[in-house]
Amino acid sequence: MASGGALSPVEEKPTVVKTTKAEQHEEEAAVAVKSAAEMMKKSSPCCPRCNSIKTKFCYYNNYSMAQPRYFCRECRRYWTQGGSLRNVPVGGGCRKSKRSSASSASASAASPPAPAVGAAPPVVPALSSAISKLLQSEPMAAPCADFPNVLPTFVSTGFELPAAAGDRLSLGSFGAFGNLSAAVAAPGGGGGSSTTTSFMDMLRGVGGLFDGVGNSHQMGGNGGGGGSYYAPLITGAGNGMLMPPPPLPPFSGSLMQHGMQGLFANHAMGGGGGGVMNAGEDGSVMAGLGGGQWPPALGGADEQQGGGDGGEAVMTKDTGGGASSSASRPDYFYGWNSAAGGVVAGGGIGGNAAAATGATPWQGLIDSSSAMM
């Protein structure tokens, strides 16, 4: 022992961290891969097929850095480094093929030619024949079926309808007035004459509404002369008349039927003396007919007096005056012309205050028909 009892210090050994072999191999592999990748990127390998240097790196096959894949621009083929070469023809990597072009050419040849733009489609013969028959067929005649609805329009337009291109259409253009032109062009004789075409002339040509008419404005001779069924109401003016009721169409509702009866049957249109159906000079209403004949007895106690009463019924005698004036008549009991008389002129010479008013012709008829609609 050394003297003095001093102890020597213990020397400490440095600790060395030992790594496992697996870790060492991993580090080495990573360094090798990095170096190989850098070399591949820096230098392009030659193509194993054509030995061309025009190659490029594409990607890693199967995401493995040990299998880089290249592409040769010269022969247009791919290869993988370290793998086997496939027997791929030149240009095998190109997706353009002759099969697609051939199929497109055959499809274009097989497609039918497009129709011309201006060519019209073929017309079916059956359809064309049906259309021609429909155009040639005449409409069914229904005279005065819509008379209350059509009359105000005809009156407001002067009994004419406007058409395109500035033309005027008369009532003869419609199917319900088919025989209109013949009736107006060839009026009958007897009782009087007129050079103008009136609305009653037009109505005479419609489906037998005024059959047996003598000629325009006057229907028969003086006082029932000429054997006409519809005798004139006055002597001298020659344009008063009694409108007979036409066959009523099947309207629904009693208001329309009552209006049609009141429009055509219940009252007379006239301007002066002379009986409605004269059998002589007494001027009674139903003197020439007897009982049970058409037209039936007109309504009202003062309108149903028999023959021989002196003609003081609807129209008074030629020398009478004012017995049946407008005091008990509705608006549509009127004279044919406003100048010939107002609502009802009581006699050929007499007349009352209503005759001097000069009411507009057809105004009352228009008001009544409008009220029925």
From Swiss-Prot:
> Which InterPro entries does this one have?
Dof, Znf_Dof
Q: Which terms are listed as keywords in the entry?
A: DNA-binding, Germination, Metal-binding, Nucleus, Transcription, Transcription regulation, Zinc, Zinc-finger
GO molecular function annotation: DNA binding; DNA-binding transcription factor activity; zinc ion binding
Task: Output compositional bias ranges, type Basic and acidic residues.
Answer: 10-23
The organism's superkingdom is given as: Eukaryota
Q: Where does Zn(2+) bind?
A: C47, C50, C72, C75
Pfam families, per database record: Zn_ribbon_Dof (PF02701)
Region: Disordered, residue numbers:
1-23, 297-327
> Zinc finger spans (Dof-type)?
45-99
Localization: Nucleus
- Kindly list the GO CC terms recorded for this protein: nucleus
* Induction notes from the record: Induced by gibberellin.
**Known role:** Transcriptional activator that binds specifically to the DNA consensus core sequence 5'-AAAG-3' also known as prolamin box. Can activate the expression of genes encoding for the seed storage proteins glutelin, prolamin and globulin. Functions synergistically with RISBZ/BZIP58 to positively regulate quantitatively many seed storage proteins. Functions synergistically with RISBZ1/BZIP58 to positively regulate some metabolic enzymes, such as alanine aminotransferase and pyruvate phosphate dikinase, that are expressed in developing seeds.
State whether it acts alone or in a complex, and with which partners, per the record. Answer: Interacts with RISBZ1/BZIP58.
Q: Which named protein is this?
A: Dof zinc finger protein 3
The organism encoding this protein is Oryza sativa subsp. japonica (Rice)
Identify the coding gene. DOF3
